[in-house]
Amino acid sequence: MIMKRFWLISMLLIGSQLRGNACAHDVTYNYYLFHTWAEPENYYLRAADASEWDNHNSDRVHQFWCDYMGKKCNYLYDRDEIEERAKQKGDKEVLDYMKLLDEYMAVSEIINHESWEYPTKEELAESKTKCRKLFAAAQNYQGTRLKPQYALLQMRANMVMDQHQANVEYWEKTGSKQPKSVFREMMENIYAGALFHTGQREKACDIFARQGDSESIQWALRKYRNVAGIRRIYADNPNSHSLYYLVDEFVNDVQETIDGQNIFHDWDNESKLDAEGLKAKRLFFSEVDAFIQLVDQVVAEGKTKDPLMWVTARGMVNYEVGRQSAAQQDMERAAKLKGREKSQDVYRCVNMLIMTANPQMSSSKMLEELTWLRDKAKKDIQSGHDYDGYHHRAIQRVVLIGLAKRYHDQGNHTMENSLHGFYQNLVYTSERTNDDAETSDWNENYSGEYFYGLDTLTAAQLVKYYDELLRPHSDPLEKMIVESVPANPDYFNDLIGTKYLADGKIEQAASYLEKVPAKFYEGLNVSYYLAHRDYHKERWMVQQRSKKDVEGINKGRFTQNPKLAFCQEVLKLQDTYKKAKPGLVRYQTAYKLGTMIFQASSAGECWPLSRYGKSYGTDFEGHFDSKTGNWSNYDALGVMARSYLEESAKSADFDLRVRSLYGLAYMPFDNWADAEYHWNNGNGFYTYTPNRNSLQYAALKKLNQCVKGSANPTPAYVTKCDVLKKFRKYQ
């Protein structure tokens, strides 16, 4: 372990000049395909952030205390309880160890590289004095139960005292003979740091690499993370393990830089770049070309035992900078070269990504490779490192960026959507059916990019997509991908019917929803709302409160399809409405329709009839711009409900007319006024500037005129309306 570590910025990423961070926007899948230096079981450590090595060991150290206490605990938080237990047991051995451990932790807190302030000379001197005493106490331990812990304490104390040569000797004579444990691994990590401080960088980096300690190797090789540095390490030892790390970093820096530019498109037009940006771009490409020349030199000299790694790196770099033909030639060349097993894995993954950009991509070859990668990714998931396993991350980038982009550019949206389904099905490892969902508290069929992609489609597009899933596919790759996406008829009929319902096409919605059984809706995450919300109640009159635990499956029971029942009732009322002449029956029917349909809109309390989720704080998806007269995020049901209330507001019946106008005034299509907050003499208050062209303003104006111009007593709900009171003051 190296005491001082800093966050490093590659010369390829020149901060403000490039402005790109490929991890700074949604859904990039910017996972590094080029990983050759970490051991397979530590891929997840390399893929995660640099502190994962410490976190990984910390969890295993805490396990010692969990075993001692017989329950889950953490020494940092449960120290007093552990001490009390040791006292109860009369366990002097553990109590003595805890005392020394606390002393070391106190010293470590002072010199820790993450401390807010650097320690003073006096604090450093005092820390070394304490560590000399700590070392002596640990050295005098005569027991066996805590021997690994005391051995680790000795090496930690030496590390603080800068006794690096002593740590080298202690490990080689004593520490290395300890049985395998987390404490032995931590001792070896300190040994590697000692090797580095005594001039044995090569051996130190080999250990850091084997352990997956990216933070330490990053510090140890900080001066070599460019082509010139790679060339120097290669000249010293053509087969140095450090080269795997450095080549990885170079290739991945290229990938991250290009991904960042793909977001901002800064490099597409050099005329848009300032002088610094242009300089950065040219420096970047000069480094890329220098790296390619170095690869050619390495392979030509024949000194490396892993030419496959080098040429694969060349191909990945060429691919990232847009030299697709050169990248394909590199992959053809690499296929004939030898390399370690890890390099072979990386070659196959990189080759797959490059294949996706080839107009003549072999579908059968891609199928073969994707099947191999899928099986590898499954093992990642089963290992428990489902989001950090190398092959899992590789399949994300190959499938969701490489192949998905290919089919998007071809206009093949069936394959583009199905690839997301293929990946999601791989992760969740269950079929897309609501029966399967019953084993969980949450139905994953309604989350994830695959569902979100389907949810953006129109009803007609969903119909087409579902038909495409069902038809035979002759292309072997397309056949495998499409068939991996479960085409549950209940799921898709509900999706399509719900889309039509949201569009206000009630009859078409019913034709699909009538195919879906009632029990299906018990498996929806919105089952509670569907079962317990009443769309006959006026949203502007009644607030339907819910219990706390309302989200997830099996929160409601159904004897009939709730969406179909809604559609059938609306269709029946619409038939009555169409046949009725202007008069009370027509207006009452219009009011019922306006009430029901508004409840099913995004602003209603029965919104799960027309959608599967809703953002908190979002009252209404539709908005009317009174200045332009245009709609944005059009909500067909909300607009339809308004038209029915406008009709019922024509009624001569005072109560019906007032209720209709009150409902219109409630609808949040726009705001009747702009509110401005003021603060004066310790008091806060609002003033309102009316938007006289807004729909809500017009509704409030009509409501006000109606109740003021009538001899009928004003209903209490109108009298108490705060919004109407403000309207009367500021109109």
Regions found by a protein language model. Name each.
Residues 1-3:
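N-terminal secretory signal peptides that target proteins for export/translocation
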Residues 5-6, 20:
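Hydrophobic alpha-helical segments, especially transmembrane helices
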Residues 6-15:
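Sec-dependent N-terminal signal peptides
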Residues 20-156, 161-731:
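Extracytoplasmic/secretory-pathway proteins
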